[in-house]
Amino acid sequence: MTTGRKVMVLGLDGMEPYTAKRLMDAGKMPNLKKMVENGAARENLELLGSMPTITPAQWTTLACGCNPGVHGITDFWNQDPENLDTIIYGLDSRLCQAEQLWNVTARAGLKTLVWQWPGSSWPPSSDSENLMVVDGTQPASVNYSIANIDIEKYVEASTEITENEFIDHIGSKNLGDAATDCVIDELDLEEESDEDKYAEFDASKTDAKANRAELLLNRYKMKRIKNVDFHKQGGAAMEQLAKVPFDKIKSTISEPTKWAKELPEGAREFITYTAGGQMRRPCLILKNADGIYDTVEVYRSKKDAEPLCTIVGEEMVTDVLDENLDHGKKTMATRSYKVLEIAPDGSKVRMWMSTAFKVDCDDRWSPKSIYKEVIENCGYVPPFTQMGGTTLEFAQKILTPSWEHNAMWQSRAINYLIKEKDLDVVFSHHHFIDHSAHQFWNFALQKPGMAPEEEYQKQIDKTYEVADEYIGSYLHLLDEGWTIILTSDHGEQIHTMPPARLGSAGGASAGIMRELGYTVMKKDENGNDTAEVDFSKTKALAVRTSYIWINTKGRDKYGSRQVRSRRTDHRRSLQIS
């Protein structure tokens, strides 16, 4: 091993010891085995965590060395100090009340990089020239909450489809032929910025279906939320996350017309859309030398001589640079494409288009100059997918491969900065195990109507094999005087039945607490419960994932209860009146 001063904290969110050890012992994680054999670890690779086992709270504990009750990042959302039913975004370093270790190392003269560390890294809490910070305002991936300007899309093209159809991800709004004719050359739309739009989010004032989609897709942009979850069917959070909406495109396959260039014999065409259905992109289906259709080319327009990208077979094509719209203004963005199916006779194509990430996006890189260096030397920040939970094919062909690409890009970027900036300390985090777990782990125990559980079990193993590849990309540092600390924050559970939901990741929970009589909702004119808490009758409210607050007089804005405390046999009991 090493005796040098250089240290890397290699964080893998959601990586749990039992699966890791099982696969290591089976020879499927050789890089992890190399670390264990040449370093130090508990026999079963177990880690010591703190409560609650929530990403931002745990990673802040790792950064500060104290529990959430001390450092103050207590969940994805912190409690609003003024209103019990309101929560404020918790992944904000300004909420952290303890000193992060990276500020200590930077102050000590060590060149330090903090990369996508969720909970307490952004904005930078030190102005030291030795400190570099990249994002960390959400756990998913670098730039995710600010660069994604066009949601991912699932394209079905067929000779049997007679009309082009764009189906919006939120409202299932069918734009039909209007979308086909709406090719945008110049657009001047006045839209409020995300910063203004999501400053306050009151779910009780929005359509229920739209509200669910907004929370799911844009929760990392919201600063303050007032939302009540009733858990009517006791659904599991993992199953909700597995059903992330996406745009769906239906397109007719036909003989190509009005192309400026000469096309190969037998070429066919279809249309896909970008920019929320406001820009169309013509596509060609081409034969190989054997006369089998196996290639799709995507073009900006039929006037172009060269395609935006060429997809052969089922390969994933990344870093596809194209125009898109950001609040109505044209901007350059990058996305990935993958053909899921192409009929040998060219009569059918199924294709995935990833989220589009705008390229001009250095807002959460400090100093900003390192963003340009990274994309010039390591490639554009790669989007990932929110699809893949309930559909095994998506998990196998899209989710795991896109995360593998994202992870290895991150490795290239961090290794580049280590070398070029002569770094001494790195705090890094990657989220692909946790995200994959939320998408499909729960189907590794057979669920009605789902693919065989064994297939999902194989996909879990594949995810950990990608993790091992990612770990291995840093092991060269051991020969260069580095110490690597591999760590995680929590594991994941698999349920045979949906668990009882006492908490809510996105607001207050009125399910069990309402049944027990502790939480009372205001009534509408028909005597039905609304989504607003009646604090004059509410004794206590479950808020966020892990907390119950007593509606206390003298402390809370609408406090209605007196609380008395007494100790008996070293236990404390509360009397609420």
Where would I find each of the regions flagged by the language model?
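Short, solvent-exposed loop/edge-beta patches enriched in aromatic
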Residues: 11, 67-69, 106-111, 419-423
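Nucleic acid-processing catalytic cores of prokaryotic defense/repair systems
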Residues: 49-52, 57-63, 71, 75-79
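Active-site-proximal, well-structured secondary-structure segments within enzyme catalytic domains
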Residues: 369-400, 430-458
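Secreted, luminal/periplasmic, and some membrane-associated catalytic domains
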Residues: 2-5, 12, 18-21, 26-27, ...
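Positions that flank functional sites
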Residues: 51, 119-121, 433
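Active-site regions of oxyanion-processing enzymes, predominantly non-cytosolic
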Residues: 4-7, 113-114, 360, 406-440
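Short helix C-cap/helix-to-loop transition motifs enriched in small/turn-promoting residues
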Residues: 42, 68-71
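A long, amphipathic alpha-helix that forms part
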Residues: 400-421, 425-426, 442-484, 494, ...
